[in-house]
Regions:
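Short beta-strand-to-loop element that shapes/binds the nucleotide-sugar donor at the catalytic cleft/hinge
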Residues: 183-204
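Acidic donor-binding loop at a coil-to-helix junction in glycosyltransferase catalytic cores
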Residues: 259-266
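N-proximal low-complexity "stem/linker" segments adjacent to membrane-targeting elements
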Residues: 7-68, 74-78
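Terminal low-complexity segments of carbohydrate-biosynthetic enzymes
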Residues: 11-15, 32, 77, 96, ...
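Conserved donor-nucleotide/metal-binding helix-loop-beta segment in metal-dependent transferases, i.e.
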Residues: 165-186
Length: 448
């Protein structure tokens, strides 16, 4: 591991050592169930059945080989009614990796956080921060990092495999540094490789994708990013290969009202509030998801996502305190999906795919959703994130260094070791010290 050395002559304040919390959400269901259409805000790409091993052990095994890993928080998002069994299942899995300092965060720990919120008169914030919904789960990870004193956070997903022992070192590279123009690098994304070692979208340029060439647009963008300097402003975010500096997550939360695509949405939020996410073309891992929801149902979720995003971006342009983010600044991806006419494109794509793809029934349902539930959802909720943003910095200020909450959490979470399950002392968890690189060298690898 690249430990931070003592300062050399002329290097004052140019080195920074980072202590990231690694956060891994895992989603547990009672069986291979398909969520109801009426609950579009909490549909996951895939869940692990309670009686199945799932992908988490494979992920932790690969993380075991990574240099510099300090604390790992596994957030257990369980279907209602099986929270206790899911917690026991994940604790048993964590116990197989005694070399990792794993905190298993369950409904019990969440209740501790919420009770403290109430004591601090912040409200319980049950929708915005919790163990249900992609963004709420990520927000819980941010809150935990803030409470426990970590200066950064790295999100990975339980269906990923890390092959590079320097994964965290690459993730921390440049984080917290200033570019030549004085712009802080506060958020970074890497990229995914599939089972064949390819980073490109496999979405095909078929006739039924004429109005929805998302894969081609993404491939065009990532080819440009991979060919350029190591760090460049990103138009895309891989939420399972994402590093955030505390100065980013203390200011901005994830948006609990977006059904999926919360990672790209975070990029747009950062831009609206005057910051950015940087793409690191040397930082990657393998994404090996199991079979999840049907492609028609996934497209339905995309409809909710893009209509909501379009409405939200439109609303943001009416706010004088926000930076305007234009679709033209997000070419070739995702700009075209944030332009007027998105509803017509969605309808046409759903109809064409209902003919050309096997999942025709779900695509026909999706086409109907444009004019009904999805449009209404976007209209009803597009302002709520900005209202929550008035509250979020206060949450961060009030919980940072809160010894009562910190100690209560440390007493509650369990750390799995060779001797069994023990309570983790605070000192044992704050062990990572990863060099973010020399400022001068980082600046040579940044495209501005």
């Amino acid at each position: 591991m690249k430990h931070c050395p003592g300062r050399l002559p002329g290097e004052k304040r140019k080195r920074a050592c980072m202590n990231p919390l690694v956060v891994i959400p895992t989603y547990i269901s009672s069986r291979h169930s398909v969520p109801s259409d009426r609950n579009d805000a909490v549909v996951y790409d895939h869940t692990t059945p309670l009686m199945s091993e799932g992908e988490l052990p494979r992920c932790l095994k690969s993380l075991n080989r990574v240099r510099g890993v300090g604390a790992v928080a596994v957030l257990v998002a369980a279907e209602r009614g099986i929270e206790q069994q899911a917690a026991e299942k994940v604790r048993e899995i964590a116990s197989r990796f005694p070399l990792l300092s794993i905190m298993v965060v369950t409904a019990g720990e969440l209740d501790i956080v919420r009770r403290r919120f109430e004591q601090l008169r912040l409200g319980r914030l049950e929708f915005e921060i919790g163990l249900s919904g992609y963004s709420a789960i990520r927000n819980l990870g941010l809150v935990l990092a803030n409470i426990l004193g970590f200066d950064s956070i790295v999100f990975i997903d339980d269906d990923e495999v890390i092959d590079d022992a320097s994964f965290l070192e690459k993730g921390m590279y440049g984080l917290g540094k200033l570019t030549r123009r004085g712009i802080p690098i506060l958020a970074k994304s890497g990229y995914y490789l599939n089972a064949e070692g390819n980073c490109h979208s496999l979405s095909q340029d078929k006739w039924y994708n004429r109005y929805w060439n998302q894969g081609r647009a993404f491939n065009q963008w990532i080819d440009q990013a991979l060919a350029g300097p190591r760090l460049s402003r990103s138009n895309h975010v891989c939420g399972g290969c994402l590093a955030l500096h505390k100065e980013a997550f203390k200011r901005l939360s994830f948006d609990p009202w977006i059904p999926r695509g919360e990672d790209l949405d975070y990029l747009l939020n950062l831009r609206m509030y005057g910051s950015d996410i940087w793409f690191d073309n040397k930082w990657c891992l393998r994404h090996l998801p199991p079979k999840g929801i049907s492609e028609g149902r996934r497209f339905r979720q995309d409809i909710f996502r893009w209509l909501y995003e379009f409405r939200k971006m439109e609303y943001s342009r009416t706010q004088i305190d926000l930076q305007q983010v234009k679709p033209s600044s997000l070419e070739p991806y995702p700009g075209p999906f944030l332009q007027p006419g998105i509803e017509k494109r969605i309808r046409k794509t759903a109809k064409l795919r209902s003919i050309g793809r096997p999942d025709g029934k779900e695509y026909r349902k999706a086409a109907k959703a444009v004019a009904t539930e999805a449009s209404e959802y976007a209209r009803r909720n597009c302002t709520r994130y900005f209202e929550f943003q008035y509250v979020w910095p206060e949450i961060m200020v009030r919980t940072e260094g809160d010894s009562i909450l910190r100690n209560a959490l440390l007493r509650s979470v369990v750390l799995c070791s060779e001797e069994g399950v023990i309570e983790p002392p605070a000192e044992q968890m704050m062990t990572a010290s990863i060099d973010a690189g020399l400022t001068k060298e980082v600046r040579l690898n940044v495209s501005e």
